[in-house]
Amino acid sequence: MPLPVQVFNLQSAVEPMQIDADPQDDQQNMPDVNYVVENPTLDLEQYASSYSGLMRIERLQFIADRCPQLRVEALKMALSFVQRTFNVDVYEDIHRKLAEASREVQNAPDAVPEGSMEPPALDTSWVEATRKKALLKLEKLDTDLKNYKGNSIKESIRRGHDDLGDHYLDCGDLSNALKCYSRARDYCTSAKHVINMCLNVIKVSVYLQNWSHVLSYVSKAESTPEIAEQRGERDSQTQAVLTKLKCAAGLAELAARKYKQAAKCFLLASFDHCDFPELLSPSNVAVYGGLCALATFDRQELQRNVISSSSFKLFLELEPQVRDIIFKFYESKYASCLKMLDEIKDNLLLDMYLAPHVRTLYTQIRNRALIQYFSPYVSADMYKMATAFNTTVSALEDELTQLILEGLINARIDSHSKILYARDVDQRSTTFEKSLQMGREFQRRAKAMILRAAVLRNQIHVKSPPREGSQGELTPANSQSRLSTNM
Protein backbone atom coordinates (compact mmCIF):
# COMPACT_ATOMS: atom_id res chain seq x y z
CA MET A 1 0.00 0.00 0.00
CA PRO A 2 1.25 3.54 -0.67
CA LEU A 3 2.66 5.48 2.24
CA PRO A 4 0.53 8.57 2.89
CA VAL A 5 2.94 11.25 3.95
CA GLN A 6 1.46 14.41 5.42
CA VAL A 7 3.94 17.21 5.95
CA PHE A 8 3.30 19.60 8.82
CA ASN A 9 5.33 22.78 9.19
CA LEU A 10 5.84 23.73 12.85
CA GLN A 11 4.74 27.48 13.56
CA SER A 12 -9.99 50.04 35.46
CA ALA A 13 -9.07 53.49 34.50
CA VAL A 14 -7.47 55.85 37.00
CA GLU A 15 -8.29 59.03 35.14
CA PRO A 16 -11.97 60.10 35.04
CA MET A 17 -11.71 61.02 31.38
CA GLN A 18 -12.08 58.69 28.42
CA ILE A 19 -9.35 58.45 25.85
CA ASP A 20 -9.71 56.89 22.44
CA ALA A 21 -7.31 53.98 22.25
CA ASP A 22 -4.61 54.16 19.65
CA PRO A 23 -5.21 51.38 17.09
CA GLN A 24 -1.52 50.53 17.36
CA ASP A 25 -1.98 49.71 21.05
CA ASP A 26 -4.51 47.00 20.15
CA GLN A 27 -1.93 45.44 17.86
CA GLN A 28 0.81 45.58 20.47
CA ASN A 29 -0.01 42.12 21.78
CA MET A 30 -0.43 40.61 18.33
CA PRO A 31 2.33 38.21 17.33
CA ASP A 32 4.87 39.30 14.75
CA VAL A 33 4.20 37.32 11.59
CA ASN A 34 5.80 39.14 8.69
CA TYR A 35 9.24 40.35 9.65
CA VAL A 36 12.76 40.06 8.31
CA VAL A 37 15.88 39.72 10.45
CA GLU A 38 18.79 41.57 8.87
CA ASN A 39 21.59 41.42 11.45
CA PRO A 40 21.72 38.03 13.15
CA THR A 41 24.70 37.00 15.25
CA LEU A 42 23.72 33.34 15.28
CA ASP A 43 26.27 30.55 14.89
CA LEU A 44 24.04 28.40 12.70
CA GLU A 45 26.08 25.21 12.89
CA GLN A 46 26.27 25.29 16.68
CA TYR A 47 22.58 26.22 16.88
CA ALA A 48 21.48 23.32 14.67
CA SER A 49 23.62 20.80 16.56
CA SER A 50 21.52 21.43 19.69
CA TYR A 51 18.49 19.74 18.10
CA SER A 52 17.68 16.41 16.52
CA GLY A 53 15.04 14.91 14.26
CA LEU A 54 12.23 16.97 12.85
CA MET A 55 12.92 19.84 15.26
CA ARG A 56 16.30 20.55 13.64
CA ILE A 57 14.74 20.64 10.16
CA GLU A 58 11.86 22.87 11.21
CA ARG A 59 14.04 25.34 13.09
CA LEU A 60 16.41 25.67 10.13
CA GLN A 61 13.47 26.23 7.78
CA PHE A 62 12.07 28.88 10.12
CA ILE A 63 15.41 30.73 10.08
CA ALA A 64 15.59 30.44 6.29
CA ASP A 65 12.12 31.96 5.91
CA ARG A 66 12.96 35.02 8.03
CA CYS A 67 16.63 35.76 7.57
CA PRO A 68 17.90 36.40 4.00
CA GLN A 69 21.49 36.50 5.24
CA LEU A 70 21.32 32.93 6.58
CA ARG A 71 18.77 31.54 4.13
CA VAL A 72 21.09 29.60 1.81
CA GLU A 73 23.24 28.21 4.61
CA ALA A 74 20.21 27.14 6.67
CA LEU A 75 18.55 25.43 3.71
CA LYS A 76 21.75 23.57 2.80
CA MET A 77 22.07 22.28 6.35
CA ALA A 78 18.41 21.26 6.41
CA LEU A 79 18.75 19.53 3.03
CA SER A 80 21.77 17.57 4.24
CA PHE A 81 20.03 16.46 7.41
CA VAL A 82 16.68 15.55 5.86
CA GLN A 83 18.45 13.00 3.65
CA ARG A 84 19.08 10.94 6.79
CA THR A 85 15.32 10.47 7.15
CA PHE A 86 12.46 9.10 5.03
CA ASN A 87 10.91 12.56 4.73
CA VAL A 88 10.94 12.78 0.93
CA ASP A 89 8.32 15.53 0.57
CA VAL A 90 10.22 17.87 2.89
CA TYR A 91 13.43 17.10 0.97
CA GLU A 92 11.80 18.20 -2.29
CA ASP A 93 10.30 21.29 -0.63
CA ILE A 94 13.65 22.36 0.87
CA HIS A 95 15.44 21.76 -2.43
CA ARG A 96 12.92 23.98 -4.24
CA LYS A 97 13.42 26.75 -1.66
CA LEU A 98 17.20 26.40 -1.92
CA ALA A 99 17.10 26.75 -5.71
CA GLU A 100 14.97 29.90 -5.41
CA ALA A 101 17.26 31.36 -2.74
CA SER A 102 20.35 30.66 -4.85
CA ARG A 103 18.81 32.42 -7.84
CA GLU A 104 18.02 35.45 -5.66
CA VAL A 105 21.63 35.56 -4.46
CA GLN A 106 22.97 35.35 -8.02
CA ASN A 107 20.70 38.24 -9.06
CA ALA A 108 22.12 40.36 -6.22
CA PRO A 109 25.90 39.88 -6.42
CA ASP A 110 26.59 42.38 -3.62
CA ALA A 111 24.68 40.16 -1.22
CA VAL A 112 26.55 36.96 -2.08
CA PRO A 113 28.05 35.56 1.15
CA GLU A 114 31.53 34.14 1.10
CA GLY A 115 31.73 30.49 0.12
CA SER A 116 28.44 30.60 -1.77
CA MET A 117 27.94 27.60 -4.07
CA GLU A 118 25.40 26.34 -6.55
CA PRO A 119 22.69 24.21 -4.90
CA PRO A 120 23.13 20.46 -5.36
CA ALA A 121 20.97 18.87 -8.03
CA LEU A 122 17.76 17.15 -6.96
CA ASP A 123 18.73 13.57 -6.12
CA THR A 124 15.90 11.75 -7.88
CA SER A 125 17.51 8.35 -7.36
CA TRP A 126 17.58 8.96 -3.60
CA VAL A 127 13.94 10.08 -3.72
CA GLU A 128 12.78 6.92 -5.48
CA ALA A 129 14.94 4.61 -3.36
CA THR A 130 13.78 6.26 -0.14
CA ARG A 131 10.12 6.00 -1.09
CA LYS A 132 10.55 2.28 -1.74
CA LYS A 133 12.47 1.73 1.51
CA ALA A 134 9.83 3.61 3.47
CA LEU A 135 7.04 1.55 1.90
CA LEU A 136 8.83 -1.75 2.54
CA LYS A 137 9.56 -0.81 6.14
CA LEU A 138 5.95 0.25 6.67
CA GLU A 139 4.66 -3.07 5.31
CA LYS A 140 7.09 -5.02 7.51
CA LEU A 141 6.13 -3.10 10.65
CA ASP A 142 2.43 -3.47 9.85
CA THR A 143 2.83 -7.23 9.34
CA ASP A 144 4.78 -7.56 12.58
CA LEU A 145 2.06 -5.70 14.46
CA LYS A 146 -0.64 -7.99 13.07
CA ASN A 147 1.38 -11.02 14.20
CA TYR A 148 1.79 -9.54 17.67
CA LYS A 149 -1.96 -8.97 17.90
CA GLY A 150 -2.53 -12.57 16.83
CA ASN A 151 -0.30 -13.75 19.67
CA SER A 152 -2.02 -11.33 22.12
CA ILE A 153 1.25 -10.29 23.76
CA LYS A 154 0.63 -6.82 25.17
CA GLU A 155 4.27 -5.78 25.41
CA SER A 156 4.96 -6.76 21.79
CA ILE A 157 1.83 -4.94 20.58
CA ARG A 158 2.87 -1.81 22.48
CA ARG A 159 6.35 -1.90 20.94
CA GLY A 160 4.82 -2.51 17.53
CA HIS A 161 2.69 0.64 17.79
CA ASP A 162 5.72 2.62 18.97
CA ASP A 163 7.82 1.36 16.06
CA LEU A 164 5.09 2.32 13.60
CA GLY A 165 4.84 5.74 15.22
CA ASP A 166 8.61 6.21 14.96
CA HIS A 167 8.50 5.30 11.27
CA TYR A 168 5.62 7.66 10.47
CA LEU A 169 7.45 10.41 12.36
CA ASP A 170 10.60 9.74 10.32
CA CYS A 171 8.47 10.10 7.18
CA GLY A 172 6.99 13.39 8.40
CA ASP A 173 3.48 11.94 8.74
CA LEU A 174 2.64 13.45 12.11
CA SER A 175 -1.06 12.57 12.07
CA ASN A 176 -0.46 8.82 11.73
CA ALA A 177 2.47 8.99 14.17
CA LEU A 178 0.16 10.51 16.78
CA LYS A 179 -2.46 7.80 16.19
CA CYS A 180 0.10 5.00 16.61
CA TYR A 181 1.62 6.45 19.77
CA SER A 182 -1.87 6.98 21.25
CA ARG A 183 -2.94 3.40 20.48
CA ALA A 184 -0.01 2.11 22.53
CA ARG A 185 -1.83 3.37 25.63
CA ASP A 186 -4.18 0.36 25.73
CA TYR A 187 -1.20 -2.00 25.91
CA CYS A 188 0.85 -0.31 28.64
CA THR A 189 1.48 -2.67 31.54
CA SER A 190 3.53 -0.43 33.82
CA ALA A 191 3.89 3.22 34.85
CA LYS A 192 7.12 3.38 32.85
CA HIS A 193 5.25 2.40 29.68
CA VAL A 194 2.56 5.04 30.33
CA ILE A 195 5.22 7.73 30.77
CA ASN A 196 6.97 6.67 27.55
CA MET A 197 3.64 6.79 25.69
CA CYS A 198 2.89 10.25 27.11
CA LEU A 199 6.32 11.58 26.08
CA ASN A 200 5.84 10.30 22.52
CA VAL A 201 2.39 11.90 22.25
CA ILE A 202 3.70 15.14 23.77
CA LYS A 203 6.57 15.29 21.27
CA VAL A 204 4.30 14.90 18.23
CA SER A 205 1.70 17.27 19.70
CA VAL A 206 4.39 19.95 20.04
CA TYR A 207 5.31 19.45 16.36
CA LEU A 208 1.61 19.84 15.52
CA GLN A 209 1.37 22.80 17.93
CA ASN A 210 -1.63 21.15 19.58
CA TRP A 211 -0.94 22.77 22.95
CA SER A 212 -4.05 21.59 24.80
CA HIS A 213 -3.05 18.02 23.94
CA VAL A 214 0.44 18.70 25.27
CA LEU A 215 -0.85 19.92 28.65
CA SER A 216 -3.32 17.05 28.87
CA TYR A 217 -0.62 14.40 28.45
CA VAL A 218 1.81 16.23 30.72
CA SER A 219 -0.88 16.00 33.39
CA LYS A 220 -1.39 12.29 32.65
CA ALA A 221 2.32 11.58 32.97
CA GLU A 222 2.64 13.56 36.20
CA SER A 223 -0.25 11.62 37.73
CA THR A 224 1.45 8.22 37.27
CA PRO A 225 2.62 6.68 40.57
CA GLU A 226 6.25 6.76 39.49
CA ILE A 227 6.14 10.58 39.30
CA ALA A 228 3.31 11.57 41.67
CA GLU A 229 4.26 9.43 44.67
CA GLN A 230 7.92 10.41 44.84
CA ARG A 231 8.70 13.25 47.19
CA GLY A 232 11.98 14.92 48.04
CA GLU A 233 14.94 13.25 46.37
CA ARG A 234 14.14 11.70 43.00
CA ASP A 235 16.30 9.27 41.10
CA SER A 236 18.07 10.40 37.95
CA GLN A 237 15.62 8.75 35.55
CA THR A 238 12.56 10.25 37.21
CA GLN A 239 14.17 13.69 37.32
CA ALA A 240 14.95 13.44 33.60
CA VAL A 241 11.31 12.60 32.83
CA LEU A 242 10.05 15.42 35.05
CA THR A 243 12.37 17.90 33.31
CA LYS A 244 11.02 16.86 29.91
CA LEU A 245 7.45 17.28 31.15
CA LYS A 246 8.15 20.74 32.60
CA CYS A 247 9.86 21.88 29.39
CA ALA A 248 6.93 20.70 27.26
CA ALA A 249 4.43 22.34 29.63
CA GLY A 250 6.51 25.54 29.51
CA LEU A 251 6.29 25.60 25.71
CA ALA A 252 2.51 25.11 25.87
CA GLU A 253 2.06 27.88 28.44
CA LEU A 254 4.30 30.16 26.38
CA ALA A 255 2.21 29.52 23.28
CA ALA A 256 -0.93 30.33 25.31
CA ARG A 257 0.70 33.64 26.36
CA LYS A 258 0.64 32.59 30.03
CA TYR A 259 4.13 33.88 30.61
CA LYS A 260 4.26 33.62 34.41
CA GLN A 261 3.13 30.00 34.35
CA ALA A 262 5.62 29.30 31.55
CA ALA A 263 8.43 30.81 33.62
CA LYS A 264 7.52 28.63 36.59
CA CYS A 265 7.61 25.51 34.41
CA PHE A 266 11.03 26.30 32.92
CA LEU A 267 12.42 27.18 36.36
CA LEU A 268 11.53 23.67 37.58
CA ALA A 269 13.74 22.03 34.93
CA SER A 270 16.89 20.30 36.16
CA PHE A 271 20.06 21.31 34.35
CA ASP A 272 21.78 17.96 34.93
CA HIS A 273 18.84 16.08 33.39
CA CYS A 274 17.88 18.45 30.57
CA ASP A 275 18.32 16.27 27.49
CA PHE A 276 15.41 16.81 25.10
CA PRO A 277 16.92 17.73 21.69
CA GLU A 278 13.73 16.60 19.93
CA LEU A 279 12.05 19.73 21.32
CA LEU A 280 14.45 22.27 22.83
CA SER A 281 17.96 22.84 24.15
CA PRO A 282 19.18 23.92 27.61
CA SER A 283 19.91 27.34 26.10
CA ASN A 284 16.25 27.62 25.13
CA VAL A 285 15.24 26.91 28.73
CA ALA A 286 17.51 29.75 29.90
CA VAL A 287 16.13 32.25 27.36
CA TYR A 288 12.45 31.28 27.61
CA GLY A 289 12.48 31.04 31.40
CA GLY A 290 14.60 34.16 31.90
CA LEU A 291 12.54 36.47 29.67
CA CYS A 292 9.17 35.19 30.92
CA ALA A 293 10.32 35.67 34.53
CA LEU A 294 11.62 39.15 33.77
CA ALA A 295 8.28 40.12 32.22
CA THR A 296 6.05 38.78 35.00
CA PHE A 297 7.95 38.38 38.31
CA ASP A 298 8.23 41.11 40.92
CA ARG A 299 11.60 41.87 42.53
CA GLN A 300 11.15 39.38 45.35
CA GLU A 301 10.12 36.56 43.01
CA LEU A 302 12.96 37.39 40.63
CA GLN A 303 15.51 37.29 43.43
CA ARG A 304 14.14 34.14 45.06
CA ASN A 305 13.26 32.02 42.01
CA VAL A 306 15.80 33.13 39.41
CA ILE A 307 18.85 34.90 40.82
CA SER A 308 19.14 32.66 43.90
CA SER A 309 18.15 29.45 42.11
CA SER A 310 21.14 27.09 42.13
CA SER A 311 19.64 25.01 39.30
CA PHE A 312 18.58 27.84 36.98
CA LYS A 313 21.94 29.58 37.44
CA LEU A 314 23.50 26.70 35.48
CA PHE A 315 21.10 27.31 32.60
CA LEU A 316 21.92 31.04 32.63
CA GLU A 317 25.64 30.26 32.33
CA LEU A 318 24.85 29.04 28.80
CA GLU A 319 23.31 32.42 27.93
CA PRO A 320 25.49 35.08 29.62
CA GLN A 321 23.63 37.92 27.86
CA VAL A 322 20.30 36.85 29.35
CA ARG A 323 21.97 36.43 32.74
CA ASP A 324 23.44 39.95 32.56
CA ILE A 325 20.06 41.39 31.48
CA ILE A 326 18.38 39.86 34.53
CA PHE A 327 21.06 41.18 36.89
CA LYS A 328 20.97 44.68 35.33
CA PHE A 329 17.19 44.74 35.70
CA TYR A 330 17.39 43.65 39.34
CA GLU A 331 20.05 46.30 40.02
CA SER A 332 17.72 48.95 38.48
CA LYS A 333 20.19 49.68 35.66
CA TYR A 334 17.36 49.91 33.17
CA ALA A 335 19.15 51.71 30.33
CA SER A 336 21.82 48.98 30.17
CA CYS A 337 19.20 46.27 30.53
CA LEU A 338 17.01 47.58 27.70
CA LYS A 339 20.03 48.18 25.47
CA MET A 340 21.18 44.58 25.91
CA LEU A 341 17.66 43.36 25.18
CA ASP A 342 17.75 45.23 21.86
CA GLU A 343 21.10 43.60 21.05
CA ILE A 344 19.70 40.07 21.31
CA LYS A 345 16.33 40.83 19.72
CA ASP A 346 17.31 39.69 16.21
CA ASN A 347 18.42 36.28 17.46
CA LEU A 348 15.24 35.88 19.49
CA LEU A 349 13.16 36.60 16.39
CA LEU A 350 14.79 33.56 14.75
CA ASP A 351 13.42 31.24 17.44
CA MET A 352 10.23 29.65 16.13
CA TYR A 353 8.55 29.39 19.55
CA LEU A 354 9.68 32.70 21.04
CA ALA A 355 9.40 34.95 17.96
CA PRO A 356 5.59 35.50 18.18
CA HIS A 357 6.00 36.73 21.77
CA VAL A 358 9.10 38.95 21.56
CA ARG A 359 7.17 42.21 21.14
CA THR A 360 4.77 41.43 24.01
CA LEU A 361 7.53 40.27 26.36
CA TYR A 362 9.68 43.32 25.60
CA THR A 363 6.71 45.63 26.26
CA GLN A 364 5.95 43.94 29.57
CA ILE A 365 9.60 44.08 30.65
CA ARG A 366 9.79 47.79 29.80
CA ASN A 367 6.52 48.53 31.62
CA ARG A 368 7.73 46.66 34.70
CA ALA A 369 10.97 48.67 34.60
CA LEU A 370 9.03 51.97 34.45
CA ILE A 371 6.85 50.91 37.38
CA GLN A 372 9.83 49.85 39.49
CA TYR A 373 11.75 53.02 38.64
CA PHE A 374 8.95 55.29 39.89
CA SER A 375 7.73 53.21 42.86
CA PRO A 376 10.06 54.76 45.54
CA TYR A 377 9.41 58.39 44.55
CA VAL A 378 6.75 60.98 45.35
CA SER A 379 7.64 62.82 42.13
CA ALA A 380 9.96 62.18 39.22
CA ASP A 381 11.51 64.46 36.60
CA MET A 382 10.45 63.05 33.24
CA TYR A 383 13.55 64.47 31.54
CA LYS A 384 15.80 62.39 33.82
CA MET A 385 13.48 59.45 33.48
CA ALA A 386 13.63 59.67 29.68
CA THR A 387 17.43 59.68 29.84
CA ALA A 388 17.41 56.62 32.10
CA PHE A 389 15.22 54.75 29.62
CA ASN A 390 16.97 56.03 26.49
CA THR A 391 13.82 57.58 25.01
CA THR A 392 12.24 60.98 24.32
CA VAL A 393 10.07 62.83 26.85
CA SER A 394 7.02 62.77 24.57
CA ALA A 395 7.34 59.02 24.00
CA LEU A 396 7.82 58.48 27.73
CA GLU A 397 4.74 60.58 28.47
CA ASP A 398 2.67 58.38 26.16
CA GLU A 399 3.96 55.24 27.89
CA LEU A 400 3.24 56.62 31.35
CA THR A 401 -0.25 57.75 30.32
CA GLN A 402 -1.03 54.20 29.19
CA LEU A 403 0.28 52.74 32.45
CA ILE A 404 -1.81 55.21 34.48
CA LEU A 405 -4.95 54.39 32.49
CA GLU A 406 -4.35 50.68 33.03
CA GLY A 407 -3.99 51.27 36.76
CA LEU A 408 -0.40 50.04 36.87
CA ILE A 409 0.96 53.36 38.18
CA ASN A 410 -1.01 55.42 40.72
CA ALA A 411 0.18 58.83 39.59
CA ARG A 412 -0.65 61.95 37.58
CA ILE A 413 1.36 63.81 34.96
CA ASP A 414 2.13 67.52 35.01
CA SER A 415 2.42 67.80 31.24
CA HIS A 416 3.59 71.43 31.40
CA SER A 417 6.46 70.91 33.85
CA LYS A 418 7.06 67.32 32.70
CA ILE A 419 6.89 65.94 36.22
CA LEU A 420 5.26 62.70 37.31
CA TYR A 421 3.55 62.98 40.72
CA ALA A 422 2.49 60.02 42.84
CA ARG A 423 -1.11 60.29 43.94
CA ASP A 424 -1.45 60.97 47.68
CA VAL A 425 -3.45 58.26 49.37
CA ASP A 426 -4.94 59.19 52.73
CA GLN A 427 -4.16 56.02 54.64
CA ARG A 428 -6.19 57.19 57.66
CA SER A 429 -9.38 57.68 55.64
CA THR A 430 -8.83 54.44 53.76
CA THR A 431 -8.42 52.49 57.01
CA PHE A 432 -11.57 54.06 58.49
CA GLU A 433 -13.54 53.22 55.34
CA LYS A 434 -12.38 49.59 55.43
CA SER A 435 -13.26 49.35 59.13
CA LEU A 436 -16.77 50.72 58.55
CA GLN A 437 -17.33 48.36 55.63
CA MET A 438 -16.19 45.41 57.74
CA GLY A 439 -18.51 46.52 60.56
CA ARG A 440 -21.48 46.69 58.19
CA GLU A 441 -20.70 43.20 56.93
CA PHE A 442 -20.47 41.79 60.49
CA GLN A 443 -23.77 43.50 61.34
CA ARG A 444 -25.50 41.95 58.31
CA ARG A 445 -24.22 38.48 59.19
CA ALA A 446 -25.22 38.85 62.86
CA LYS A 447 -28.78 39.84 61.91
CA ALA A 448 -29.02 36.86 59.57
CA MET A 449 -27.82 34.48 62.31
CA ILE A 450 -30.30 35.93 64.85
CA LEU A 451 -33.14 35.56 62.35
CA ARG A 452 -32.21 31.94 61.65
CA ALA A 453 -32.01 31.14 65.37
CA ALA A 454 -35.46 32.68 65.93
CA VAL A 455 -36.95 30.67 63.04
CA LEU A 456 -35.55 27.40 64.42
CA ARG A 457 -36.61 28.20 68.00
CA ASN A 458 -40.23 28.82 66.94
CA GLN A 459 -40.29 25.74 64.70
CA ILE A 460 -41.23 27.80 61.67
CA HIS A 461 -40.89 26.02 58.38
CA VAL A 462 -42.16 26.60 54.86
CA LYS A 463 -43.71 23.72 52.99
CA SER A 464 -42.82 23.78 49.32
CA PRO A 465 -45.76 23.67 46.89
CA PRO A 466 -46.45 20.25 45.33
CA ARG A 467 -44.72 19.59 42.07
CA GLU A 468 -46.56 18.70 38.89
CA GLY A 469 -47.74 15.11 38.94
CA SER A 470 -47.13 14.69 42.70
CA GLN A 471 -49.78 14.18 45.41
CA GLY A 472 -48.57 17.05 47.54
CA GLU A 473 -46.27 14.91 49.65
CA LEU A 474 -43.21 16.34 51.27
CA THR A 475 -39.95 15.87 49.40
CA PRO A 476 -37.19 14.00 51.27
CA ALA A 477 -35.39 17.28 51.83
CA ASN A 478 -38.51 18.89 53.31
CA SER A 479 -39.21 15.85 55.45
CA GLN A 480 -35.72 15.94 56.84
CA SER A 481 -36.06 19.67 57.50
CA ARG A 482 -39.34 19.15 59.35
CA LEU A 483 -37.90 16.35 61.45
CA SER A 484 -34.93 18.48 62.41
CA THR A 485 -37.14 21.37 63.52
CA ASN A 486 -39.41 19.12 65.58
CA MET A 487 -36.52 17.50 67.43
UniProtKB/Swiss-Prot annotation:
Residue ranges of domain PCI in the record: 265-427
Keyword Nucleus applies: yes
InterPro entries, A to Z: CSN1_C (IPR048624), PCI_dom (IPR000717), Rpn7/CSN1 (IPR019585), Rpn7_N (IPR045135), WH_DNA-bd_sf (IPR036390)
SUPFAM superfamilies: Winged helix' DNA-binding domain (SSF46785)
Cysteine disulfide partners in this protein: none
GO cellular component: COP9 signalosome; cytoplasm
Cellular localisation: Cytoplasm; Nucleus
Predominant subcellular localization, coarse grouping: cytoplasm
Keyword terms of this UniProt record: Cytoplasm, Nucleus, Signalosome
Domain of life from the UniProt record: Eukaryota
Compositional bias of kind Polar residues: 472-487
One Pfam family recorded for the sequence: PCI
Renumbered residue ranges of the record's region Disordered: 103-123, 461-487
PANTHER family linked to this entry: 26S PROTESOME SUBUNIT 6, COP9 SIGNALOSOME COMPLEX SUBUNIT 1
Similarity annotation: Belongs to the CSN1 family.
Function per UniProt: Essential component of the COP9 signalosome complex (CSN), a complex involved in various cellular and developmental processes. The CSN complex is an essential regulator of the ubiquitin (Ubl) conjugation pathway by mediating the deneddylation of the cullin subunits of E3 ligase complexes, leading to modify the Ubl ligase activity.
Subunit relationships: Component of the CSN complex, probably composed of cops1, cops2, cops3, cops4, cops5, cops6, cops7, cops8 and cops9.
Name recorded for this polypeptide: COP9 signalosome complex subunit 1
Natural source organism: Xenopus laevis
Protein encoded by which gene: csn1
